[in-house]
Amino acid sequence: MINKINFVKMHGLGNDFVIVHKRDLATVCNLSQLAKNMADRHTGIGCDQCIIYEEYNNVYTMIIYNIDGSNAKLCGNATRCLAKLIYLDTGKKDITIMVGKKKLLCNVEAANKISVNVGNVSFNETWMPSRDRIWAFAERYMLDLKETMCVDIGNPHLIIFSKLEPQDQKIIGQKLQAKELFVDGVNVNFAEVKDNKIYLSVWERGAGLTLACGSGACGSFAAGLKLGFVHSPSTVVFKYGNLIMQEEDGNIIMQGEATFVMRGEYYCEK
């Protein structure tokens, strides 16, 4: 038996997603496996993450699957993409999206100007190891880290303010998934600050190095503010574009593009 699943593919600054409405998945039992299959760039559609969404009482809920089938707690780029899709389908400009218990307030100012208020961030959570433990771990593996800071923005991020080559970022990103340091893994951000701009590369847990990471941009901006490296507003720079970051009353607001790629049908053999 073959199931036909309608999907939309979008990207935020190169960070790409396959988006499916939950109503099209009534006959699918294993969503995690479906996400892995759809995300495969050789045998599926290909993406960094799969997004499943639905609406209830004018609030949208979003579930995020990584390419390994695990769940992600937050994705800023996916939030902008989903907000734009909802805008294109319904005309709504003010959109509330829930990811777990996290409420994201979105505003579509124009088709390619989408703001997301991700709320406040935390620098003191139980999952965060001490700075001394991070540095001891780095010394053991001869990792060249500069200033570091842990940030929780709904998902866990480690911000490393240091310029590193992509091959070194990959090694460090993998090493820092060690259970002894971060029990559930961590998103590792490599940030370089110049003229109030943050040049950012992110190793996402469950996905690896991606072309952009919205939650990483929010976390890196928040850490940069706390350390006095940047001021609000600031710009986070990725390979395929920028995000404008602001802080208002303790809330982090991200503004950027979301690009529609295609609508299609995915055929799932049972």
Swiss-Prot record:
Marked site positions, Could be important to modulate the pK values of the two catalytic cysteine residues: H157, E204
Pathway: Amino-acid biosynthesis; L-lysine biosynthesis via DAP pathway; DL-2,6-diaminopimelate from LL-2,6-diaminopimelate: step 1/1
E.C. code: 5.1.1.7
Reactions that this protein is recorded to catalyse: (2S,6S)-2,6-diaminopimelate = meso-2,6-diaminopimelate
Family: Belongs to the diaminopimelate epimerase family.
Subunit details: Homodimer.
Function: Catalyzes the stereoinversion of LL-2,6-diaminopimelate (L,L-DAP) to meso-diaminopimelate (meso-DAP), a precursor of L-lysine and an essential component of the bacterial peptidoglycan.
Protein name stated in the entry: Diaminopimelate epimerase
UniProt source species: Rickettsia typhi (strain ATCC VR-144 / Wilmington)
Gene: dapF
